[in-house]
Curated annotation (Swiss-Prot):
Upper taxonomic lineage: Bacteria, Bacillati, Bacillota, Clostridia, Peptostreptococcales
The protein's role, per its UniProt record: Catalyzes the cleavage of 5-oxoproline to form L-glutamate coupled to the hydrolysis of ATP to ADP and inorganic phosphate.
Gene3D superfamilies assigned to the protein according to its UniProt record, in alphabetical order: Glycoside hydrolase/deacetylase
EC number: 3.5.2.9
Oligomer status and interactors: Forms a complex composed of PxpA, PxpB and PxpC.
Stored CDD domains: LamB_YcsF_like
Catalytic reactions of this protein: 5-oxo-L-proline + ATP + 2 H2O = L-glutamate + ADP + phosphate + H(+)
Protein name (Swiss-Prot/TrEMBL): 5-oxoprolinase subunit A
Domain of life: Bacteria
Length: 263
């Protein structure tokens, strides 16, 4: 039996602006990445999303990003390692308060948008994020792109980590996500996307945008829940996983890694 986590970015509404179908997607995932007020979200929605996750038995993770509501955290910003560390601690700490007051723990941290993509390649930013998590609670899991600087930094300091793959995104030959601006970067065909996910979980490989086959490790799969079609996609993944004997469970129930248990 294969095991894999299904995660989704949630709690991204703020004020009177509603983003995503959180109540629906929470029925099908095992881990929630909750926005912490920088790129999206606000205190009221953080509280509500934590409560919804708890109600559905979904584990909670912090989803820190750049302080960029207008750009939804998808625009690159030039920051130092210390700033990356401070931003992560600040947002993680905020969500920890909501989690603790609702009788929950923080399972993981997954950076958002441009911060995620930059830290995948920038060792300094990656180390800042990992050090922040380790100093707050070394048992929290970093969720990051396979073979990225985030994962390498986690290994270096002994932070627990899990490798994330994306159901609907294309990869380049180095294992990084193809920018959304490139044609073919987002996979719209449901069957093709699910076939790719099953292959990543069971075979540990993925075909890149140029047709090359590369190695990949899938501990967790990112799925979206921001529109009705996305919800149907998540449902189809769950159905296919049952046929393929793939069990969906949260990261804490999967053998995640640290530098201490890497052979």
């Amino acid at each position: 039996m294969y095991k894999v986590d299904l995660n989704s970015d949630l709690g991204e509404s703020f004020g009177t602006y509603k983003i995503g179908l959180d109540e629906e997607v929470l029925k099908y995932i095992s881990s929630a990445n909750i926005a912490c007020g920088f790129h999206a979200g606000d205190p009221s929605h953080m509280e509500k999303t934590v409560q919804l996750a708890k109600k559905n038995g979904v584990k909670i993770g912090a989803h820190p990003g750049f302080l960029d509501l207008i750009g939804f955290g998808r625009r690159e910003m030039k920051i130092t390692k210390q700033e990356a560390k401070d931003y992560t601690k600040y947002q993680l700490g905020a969500l920890m308060a909501f989690a603790s007051s609702n009788g929950c723990n923080i399972q993981h941290v997954k950076p958002h948008g441009a911060l995620y993509n930059m830290a995948a390649k920038d060792k300094e930013l990656a180390m800042g994020i990992c050090e922040a998590i380790y100093e707050v609670d070394k048992d929290i899991i970093l969720l990051g792109l396979y073979n990225s600087e985030m994962i390498n930094s986690a290994k270096e300091i002994g932070l627990r980590f899990a490798n994330e793959v994306f159901a609907d995104r294309a990869y380049d030959n180095n294992g990084f996500l193809v920018p959304r601006s490139v044609e073919g970067a987002v996979i719209h065909d449901t069957k093709h996307a699910i076939d790719r996910v099953v292959r990543m979980v069971k075979e540990g490989t993925v075909e890149t945008l140029t047709g090359e086959v590369i190695h990949i490790k899938a501990d967790s799969i990112c799925v979206h829940g921001d529109n009705p079609k996305a919800i149907e996609f998540v449902k189809e993944i769950r159905k296919r996983f049952e046929l393929e004997s793939i069990e969906v469970c949260p990261l804490e129930n999967i053998e995640v890694c640290s530098s201490e248990n890497i052979v």
